[in-house]
Amino acid sequence: MINELSVKAKNTNNKARIAFYVTFAVSVVTFAISFFIDRFSGLVGNVGLILIAVSILIFTKYISPVYYYDIMHDSSGAAVFVVRSVTGKRQSTFCRIGLSEIVKIEREDAVARRAHKTPHGVRKYSYVPTLGPDVTHRIYTRSRYERAEIVIEASDEFAALLLEYSVAARAAEMDSEE
């Protein structure tokens, strides 16, 4: 029996907030300096512009969105894994795969994640709310049209439950084919 579940992914460190505040403060200081110097004011202003763009990128990628990892049933009754992002009033569905398409789930620390090489022909999706998390889980999927690796930041209990439900969904799919 596959029960529906929704888990809110939490930031596990403050690296993104610190990076945002530092880049934003340096960009403000750089803009202020560009008004008071005569020489290279355009260059200093452009550096400030680049830094403010970086700070906006950090804010929109790591601070503003809230990720939800959902296990639910779709309209046909099939169990699916869904990754949603909520930013303000806007909600976006990033990933929606059948639980029967999940092949395996691996726990990775930061060193293993950096050392991992995604094979050619396999798509990689990262739905991690933390900048440089200590632990992530890599979900390997195989569907009729593509193979993919999905990186999420969830608890070990959620990953084990997701794997258990994927095995149950594959077994139910095999029973329905016979």
Predicted regions and their residues:
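Extended, compositionally biased eukaryotic interaction scaffolds
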Residues: 1-4, 53-61
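N-terminal membrane-targeting/pre-transmembrane regions
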Residues: 1-29
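Hydrophobic membrane-targeting alpha-helices
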Residues: 31-32, 58
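Hydrophobic alpha-helical transmembrane segments
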Residues: 32-53
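Conserved beta-hairpin
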Residues: 56-96
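Non-transmembrane, membrane-adjacent beta-strand/coil modules in membrane-associated proteins
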Residues: 85-144
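A membrane-cytosol interface segment of integral membrane proteins
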Residues: 120-178
